[in-house]
Swiss-Prot record:
Coiled coil: none annotated. This is A-type ATP synthase subunit B. It is a peripheral membrane protein. It comes from the Archaea.
Length: 465
């Protein structure tokens, strides 16, 4: 139902501040309400109410306020919140950050319209995330297993290949099992035109676009559109998952650009800043995005999230990765040191963690040896890494044969396991077999974290017999 304000067109714009209009004398306006801004030349722009109090409404104009004046600008309140029309026709299409097609195809004929803010899930109705999602990336599938319904962010840094990794995951991700329907929803926020062309070309040339819905918000698009983009993407994901029984992987990049837009809008509203100038409600705002991942009782479909963010100055204690870590279930950390060595993807498995990995590992999901062999590989790699520091002090000549074996394991682990081609799609079986081949570098008596029967079944020494 329209509010009282929706019946009236206001010409009482009090002031213009950056992308914001302050309209006075407004009655019945609601937070999040969509408004129509009529420019002096008759052009119509869209906006959204950010604040409504004591007869004042603060409106963020999607297309910016250039050319507007306080005298001749009119504002009409629609009484509606932001919605997007959804349909299965969206698969295989590319949209801008506001949900408009930019691939030259026809407009989408919506099956229904959904509020982009979604609907809160009762915690009791949630199911524990489980079941393996294969990305084809060994450091994720093997060491930091992703499961359906999980939210697992990638912490990157400026200049690291997170875009290439995001595109590779979007191309290769799949769920195992007969008759399972899978889709990818990809949302890029605040990226350059060059990056946008890279993503669109990657999806088109590999055929991955057929099962994907792509949203692209460019760096020169309005900040408010950047705030809407992940919510629009997740609304489409919820439609595919909960109404079409699909398993949906949502990739959001770059959440740092999203948070910068949040800070920009907060500053324009003269809000009291929190840590490093970001609004004090950033934690809550991020939670409204991340918490839309999950599994729901009685529904077949699932929503899994991989948010990607660049850590300013590679600082993992920065508010954006810090708050993201509180809400999500682990993190994949990209390493500048590995990148300098020419290793792709430069995933540092030691600070990386998937808190729900155990729910997707083991018989019937991956393989019976998964948990044990990964634990052994973690311990061996950590030992080898610590020995590198020792070698820098005393030299390799001072090492025992055992130490040299661990040092060799660490080098081979990075060169053969972590390093992967940008088009190399490894199955989980290939990933686990590769771990066993690397563990064969160590003396057998060092494999204390793996059961004897697993060693005799999977160790290369016994498999060759």
């Amino acid at each position: 139902m329209a509010t009282a304000a929706s019946a009236i067109e206001y010409s009482s714009v009090k002031s213009i501040a950056g992308p914001l209009l302050i309209v006075e004398g407004v009655e019945g306006a609601a937070y999040g309400e969509i408004v129509e801004v009529i420019c002096p030349d008759g052009e119509k722009r869209m906006g959204q109410v950010l604040e409504a109090r004591e007869g004042l409404a603060v409106v963020q104009v999607f297309e910016g306020t250039t050319g507007l004046s306080t005298k001749d600008t009119r504002v009409r309140f629609t009484g509606r919140t932001a919605k997007i029309g959804v349909s299965m026709e969206m698969l295989g299409r590319i949209f801008n950050g506001a949900g408009k097609p930019i691939d030259g195809g026809p407009e989408i004929v919506p099956e229904k319209e959904l509020d982009i803010n979604g609907y809160p899930l009762n915690p009791v109705s949630r199911k524990v995330p489980s079941d393996f999602i294969q990305t084809g990336i060994s450091t994720i599938d093997g060491m930091n297993t992703l499961v359906r319904g999980q939210k697992l962010p990638i912490f990157s840094g400026s200049g690291l290949p997170h875009n290439q990794l995001a595109a590779q995951i979007a191309r290769q991700a799949k769920v195992r099992g007969e008759g399972e329907k899978f889709a990818v929803v990809f949302a890029a926020m605040g990226i350059t035109s060059e990056e946008a062309n890279f993503f669109m070309e990657e999806f088109r040339k590999t055929g991955a676009l057929e099962r994907a819905v792509v949203f692209i918000n460019l760096a020169d698009d309005p900040a408010i559109e950047r705030i809407l983009t992940p919510r629009i993407a997740l609304t489409v994901a919820e439609y595919l998952a909960y109404e079409k029984d699909m398993h949906v992987l949502v990739i959001l990049t770059d959440m740092t650009n999203y948070c910068e837009a949040l800070r920009e809008i907060s500053a324009a509203r003269n809000e009291v800043p929190g840590r490093r100038g970001y609004p004090g409600y950033m934690y809550t705002d991020l939670a409204t995005i991340y918490e839309r991942a999950g599994r729901v009782k009685g529904r077949t479909g699932t929503i899994t999230q991989i948010p990607i963010l660049t850590m300013p100055d590679d600082d993992i204690t920065h508010p954006i990765p810090d708050l993201t870590g509180y809400i999500t279930e682990g993190q994949i950390v990209l390493s500048r040191e590995l990148h300098r060595k020419g290793i792709y993807p430069p995933v540092d498995v030691l600070p990386s963690l998937s808190r729900l990995a155990g729910n997707g590992q083991g018989p019937g999901k991956t393989r019976e040896d998964h948990k044990k062999v990964v634990n052994q590989a973690y311990a061996a790699y950590a030992e080898g890494r610590s020995l590198r520091d020792l070698v820098a002090v005393v030299g390799e000549e001072a090492l025992t044969d055992r130490d040299r074996a661990y040092l060799k394991f660490a080098d081979e682990f990075e060169d053969k396991f972590v390093r992967q081609g940008k088009d190399e799609d490894r199955s989980i079986e290939e990933t686990l077999d590769l771990l066993w081949e690397l563990l064969a570098i160590l003396p057998e008596e060092e494999l204390k974290r793996v059961d004897r029967e697993l060693i005799e079944k999977y160790h290369p020494k016994y498999r060759k017999k």
